[in-house]
Design a protein with these regions (language model features):
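Catalytic core of non-heme Fe(II) oxygenases with the double-stranded beta-helix
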Residues: 79-146, 150, 154-156
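Non-heme Fe(II)/2-oxoglutarate
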Residues: 1-76, 93
Length: 157
């Protein structure tokens, strides 16, 4: 076989950061559950299943962990603009969506009931098959994922 001069050039790549929080998840879960019925006004761009998560020291600590981990990986500083609680009841899922106005998004798993759905990410590298490069991750208590706001994602049943 003739030796060829070929070089691999990466044009696009999507990184996902996985970290683990050290906060008291029981205390945070109580705050989230206590605010479950306190829903955002749909007129400001939230969905009906998103609950208000009032400012608290547990979320503040997670935000600092995420900012620290993101900086360690990218040498970029980020600041949160909003956060909320998203509690799935049995057999609930989340439709495919993204957070296109956000540079970075994150999800934190506070509690994982048996039978919880997986989070799936759908990079749009194939114009004919949206799931061609999909990746699926089982939820883990205390784990967070940091990802680009434009990255489509969903939660299975």
């Amino acid at each position: 076989m003739k030796n060829r001069n070929v070089e691999l050039i990466n044009i696009a790549r999507i990184d996902l950061l996985k970290g683990k929080t050290n906060v008291d998840l029981e205390a945070l879960a109580k705050i989230l559950l206590d605010n479950y019925d306190n829903k955002f006004d749909q007129d400001i761009g939230f969905y009906y299943e998103e609950s208000v998560c009032p400012p608290n020291k547990y979320v503040d600590a997670i935000v600092e962990e995420i900012k620290t981990d993101f900086y360690a990986a990218t040498e970029e500083n980020i600041e949160p603009t909003t956060f909320w609680g998203h509690i799935h009841e049995k057999n609930m899922s989340t439709s495919l969506h993204n957070h296109d106005k956000a540079y970075v998004s994150a999800v934190v798993y506070v509690k994982i009931p048996e039978g919880s759905g997986d989070i799936m990410f759908f990079p749009q590298f194939n114009q004919y098959d949206n799931a061609a490069y999909a990746s699926k991750f089982k939820p883990e208590e205390g784990i967070y994922y940091i990802f680009p706001g434009f990255l489509n994602h969903a939660v299975t049943r």
